[in-house]
Amino acid sequence: MSISIIPYSESLKDSLFGFYSECFPGIGKPFEPDGRHNFYNHIPEHFESFWCLVDDGIVKGSVAIRRFNEDTAELKALYLSEELRGQGYGRKLFDTAISYAREQGYARVVLDSMKSYVNARRLYDSYGFKEIENYNDNTFAEVFMELVF
């Protein structure tokens, strides 16, 4: 097993889409790359930075930062395969994104999530994220949070 976190490149697209096709149904939604998830076809244009956790070249996790406004970064696409959960890899992905946002000079990071994502919520809380009012138009999100640096 050779696990690393690397910046996204087009060469990872098929593996990423395969991972999302397996991962998304487990969290209650299908992966729809030709529908509501079409933006994943244009990762470099849609995200400021995007990372993949790969195990022997196969994508097993992801996280991204998107510029929300001049002072605010938005954390997106935090997903990790079931088999790697509970081993610190989710925290490593999260650290990668939060460190990047801090290094880029953002004053805060926001995110949206679902109430059912209990493990993710524990991670957010452990970093000091606090609940805020709805800040975006994501009709699927139930929880909105921010971390102020």
Q: What do the predicted segments below correspond to?
A:
Residues 91, 103, 115-133, 138-141:
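Conserved active-site alpha-helix within GNAT-family acetyltransferase domains
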Residues 101-112:
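Conserved GNAT acetyl-CoA-binding A-motif
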Residues 26, 49, 86, 99-103, ...:
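Conserved amphipathic alpha-helical interaction elements at protein-protein interfaces in regulatory
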Residues 70-72, 108, 142:
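A generic structural signal for beta-strand entry/edge sites
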Residues 3, 7-77, 81-83, 94-95, ...:
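Acetyl-CoA-dependent GNAT
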Residues 80, 86-99, 122, 126:
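Conserved acetyl-CoA-binding loop-helix of GNAT-fold acetyltransferases
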Residues 14, 87, 118:
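Loop/helix-junction capping segments adjacent to catalytic residues or to phosphate/diphosphate-binding pockets
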